[in-house]
Regions:
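Signature of N-terminal electron-transfer/Fe-S-associated modules in redox systems
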Residues: 1-165
């Protein structure tokens, strides 16, 4: 059964691509374990704004595990310790009361940091715009690209899903 927990966050903060970054520590109290990880970051940002501080910059789009924009390192693992899930599919029930959670941007030469947890995905976006894709075996369920879908249909589907989460 989900309950409310208190967590300490160590969040990577970096003002720009050429600036030095550092970890900042924040305390969040009464976080419902049924909240998604991104909802928890939204709550942190609301708290920071109320305190007159800059919110943590992070990227997200679909919040459905499709787009990959929310990619983060959580406690040293891509997307957190859960396997087969993206950051937006991670829920706070994976954490315990009193846990310290370290949150870092996706670090790769191909994805330089823009600010805080947001990285420049333009190299990846160019591949996608050119019609490229990556086939990855995700386990027991059929791969998402097992049935070929024409690019035009996929584009229309993405347009229809663009408002989700807003």
């Amino acid at each position: 059964m989900d309950k409310n927990i208190n967590v300490t966050l160590k969040v990577w903060r970096q003002k720009g691509p050429k600036e030095k970054g550092r970890f900042e520590t924040y305390q969040l109290n009464n976080i419902f374990q049924g909240a998604s990880f991104l909802e928890m970051l939204d709550i942190l940002n609301e708290q920071l704004i109320k305190e007159g501080k800059d919110p943590v910059v992070f990227d997200h789009d679909c919040r459905e595990g499709i787009c990959g924009m929310c990619s983060l390192y959580i406690n040293g693992h891509p997307h957190g310790a859960a396997t087969g899930a993206t950051t937006c599919q991670l829920y706070m029930r994976r954490f315990n009361d009193g846990d310290t959670i370290t949150i870092e941007p996706w670090r790769s030469a191909g994805f330089p940091i823009i600010r805080d947890l947001m990285v420049d995905r333009s190299a990846y976006d160019k591949i996608i715009q050119a019609g490229g894709f990556v086939s990855v075996n995700t386990g027991g369920v059929p791969d998402a690209n097992a049935i070929a879908i024409p690019k035009e249909d996929a584009d229309l589907a993405m347009d229809a899903a663009a408002c989700i989460g807003w």
